[in-house]
Design a protein with these regions (language model features):
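Immediate N-terminus of the mature polypeptide
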Residues: 2-536, 542-648
């Protein structure tokens, strides 16, 4: 037989090069079970729809629409309480100047002549004198005319001054001035008083945070919940800081918090009342997909169990298991069994989170679609082990802008066994620094996310003399959502663009390479087709709403567009392998594909995603799409990826 004539030397040579590591890379992946791909459209609506935002009730009091009532002749506003806040740009002189300008405007002093009458008043009196023909001679005025003239002058005098409604408008305008300076709880009030000599007293409640009280909390301690606002006590209440505090609390596992303000015990103080709702302490996700590798089985099923806040300190424990194999042989030893443990807890406050994780993946490689593949002769099996500790810190947390950074230390190892001695096992220790930022814009309806990572690794096992003992890797991921108007309609489509780029000038371990194909790459190809040390991927998804004529109610008040999405997809990628062998060239490949994608989800119960993509172009240094052997021709049909997730 032909198979029997293959020498062990040729097999060993075949598995020792970078091409082999690229082909079986997916079996060496160390990062554990992948989480759900973030739905940018859902994230955009969660941030922009008011009902989904952490509640902070801070409504500016509306004007009391009562009758004007009697008018008051106001000579001056004085402040019974006015504290200066230079850091907010508020000083007594400026506030008093604004109050005086408002008093003068509402008193209409600029319209009053030296006689004490306005032009309108004088014109009204002149019209009456002309009517009774007394313009030139007051002797023509009868007693009745004089009485009427006197009544008119009394009425004019009574209408001068400031009404109750005017005073309310003045205090509201002063309140808006304070809030424009960031004191969003400040109020200018008129205390009960008797007006003497036209002087009206005003008082300012600036909105100093006096205390934080908590209600309805069960597992979370009051001390932990107050932590988000600890530095704001006895300080001016800032909308930005209050919003950030609520978001930091709502980032904690199983916690939902809203807030509202109450009057404080001391003048100018306010109390923040936190109303707590705690969700279930655990959740479970079961997922089935065909995103796996040919050599460990395309079909995968995984289950993740998360225990939220077990200690009452905002921690989370996640235990996961994944099994990959083929549908025909799901009970044999071919494929992989992966277990994952992850625990995280806040440290040094709510902004910083410590995480420890471990991944153990036992696998056996085989190519069941091609029995003559040398992979089957080698009987390769092995274990991946990953240990990591990390610190993640949130510098800014809000609805519109977020910024964070993380530092990690990792230990990643792959052990391999085969019927012959092979040296493709890897053991790397290193660290990485990651930076994340996202920004929401409602004016142009966009959501942009960016992640940048610098990674260092040092080989713990012996490597080829021509190969460096350590490496650096730079990675950049971007994710953007843009709403695009459709011509001749009022509808908007949703365009999502994703970039994934990584660079290294060294030959990387297989588990650090970036795969060009697969469900997270060019979806017209398999995850095993090519992986690179240097690579770039672009994915574009263009989603459209269903026409209103078929946007029917499906069930439970949900309309079709709320649970179903469809769109066009296009992917392209380029990657290369850094060769360290003498007189060798770097292998490279370029792939592209296009197709359709469909998504169906129902609240937090289940989610289904399906993509159908056809190869459009493929080229490589090894003739992946040369004139002699076209990978597109070999593919014959579109690649289909599907995943089903159920949430409990």
């Amino acid at each position: 037989m032909t198979i029997a004539t293959v020498s062990t030397e040729s097999l060993a040579q075949e598995v020792s090069g970078p091409s082999f590591r690229s082909l079986v890379r997916s079996a060496f992946e160390q990062d554990g079970i992948a989480t759900e791909d973030q739905d940018l459209t859902k994230e955009f609506y969660l941030r922009t729809i008011e009902a989904n935002q952490p509640k902070l009730e801070t409504e500016i009091p509306r004007q009391n629409l009562r009758d004007d009532g009697p008018r008051i002749f106001v000579k001056k506003f004085e402040f019974a309480r006015l504290v200066e806040f230079p850091e907010a740009g508020i000083n007594r002189a400026e506030v008093e100047t604004i109050a005086e300008d408002l008093r003068s405007r509402y008193m209409k002093e600029d319209d009053i002549f030296a006689s004490g009458y306005t032009r309108t008043d004088l014109e009204e009196l002149a019209d009456y004198l002309n009517e009774v023909e007394a313009t030139d001679n007051v002797k023509n005025l009868s007693g009745k005319d004089l009485q009427q003239l006197n009544n008119m002058m009394r009425k004019q005098n009574a209408e001068r001054g400031v009404s109750y409604a005017d005073l309310e408008e003045i205090t509201n305008k002063l309140t808006l001035y304070y809030r424009s300076k960031g004191l969003f709880l400040a109020q200018v009030l008129i205390p009960a008083q008797e007006v003497v000599d036209g002087i009206i007293m005003l008082t300012v409640q600036e909105g100093i945070l006096g205390d934080v009280v908590v209600e309805n909390n069960e597992d979370y301690s009051v001390k932990l919940l107050k932590e988000a606002f600890k530095r704001n006590i006895d300080e001016l209440v800032s909308h930005t800081e209050m919003e950030e505090g609520l978001y930091l609390l709502n980032d904690l596992p199983s916690l939902n918090v809203t807030g509202y303000f109450l009057a404080g015990d001391d003048p100018g103080e306010t109390i923040l009342n936190l109303k707590v709702t705690e969700d279930a302490s655990w959740n479970m996700t079961t997922r089935a997909d065909n995103h796996g590798s040919t050599f460990t089985g395309d079909n995968r099923i995984s289950t993740s169990l998360e225990w939220q806040n077990p200690s009452g300190k905002g921690d989370a424990l996640t235990i996961s298991y994944l099994k990959s194999n083929s549908v025909e042989n799901f009970d044999n030893d071919f494929g992989s069994d992966l277990g994952q443990f992850k625990y995280s807890i806040p440290v040094f406050g709510l902004r910083t989170r410590f995480e420890i994780s471990a991944v153990y993946n036992q696998f056996k490689l085989a190519d069941q679609s091609d029995e003559s593949n040398s992979i089957n002769l080698l009987e390769i099996e092995g274990v991946n082990k990953t240990y990591a500790i990390s610190l993640d810190h949130k510098f800014s947390r809000s609805r519109a802008f977020n910024m964070s950074a993380a530092v990690s230390i990792t230990d990643k190892e792959t052990e391999l066994e085969a019927i012959i001695e092979i040296d493709t096992g890897e053991h790397v220790r290193g660290g990485e620094v990651a930076f994340s930022i996202d920004a929401l814009s409602q004016s142009v309806q966009t959501l942009n996310m960016l992640n940048f990572k610098v990674q260092f690794g040092e080989h713990q096992n012996e490597v080829d003399e021509a190969r460096s003992n350590n490496f650096y890797k730079f990675a950049l991921d971007t994710n953007s959502l843009i709403f695009v108007p459709l011509p001749f309609t009022d509808s908007k489509s949703r365009l999502i663009m994703k970039w994934r780029v990584q660079y290294s000038n060294e030959a990387l371990p297989a588990f650090e390479q970036l795969s060009l194909g697969g469900a997270n790459g060019v979806r017209a190809y398999n995850v095993r087709d090519f992986s690179g040390d240097q690579a770039a991927l672009l994915s574009v998804e263009w989603y459209f709403n269903m026409p209103e004529v078929i946007n029917v109610n499906v069930w439970g008040g949900k309309r079709l567009n709320e649970v179903f999405q469809f769109g066009l997809i296009a992917d392209a990628g380029y990657g290369s392998l850094n060769s360290y062998e003498a007189d060798s060239v770097d292998n490279w490949a370029a792939l592209a594909g296009a197709g359709l994608t469909f998504k169906l989800n129902w609240e937090e119960k289940f989610a289904i995603q399906l993509s159908v993509s056809h190869p459009m172009m493929s080229k490589s240094s090894e003739g992946l799409n040369s004139s002699e052997a076209s990978f597109v021709d070999e593919a014959k049909s579109a690649q289909v990826y599907a995943d089903f997730s159920f949430f409990f």
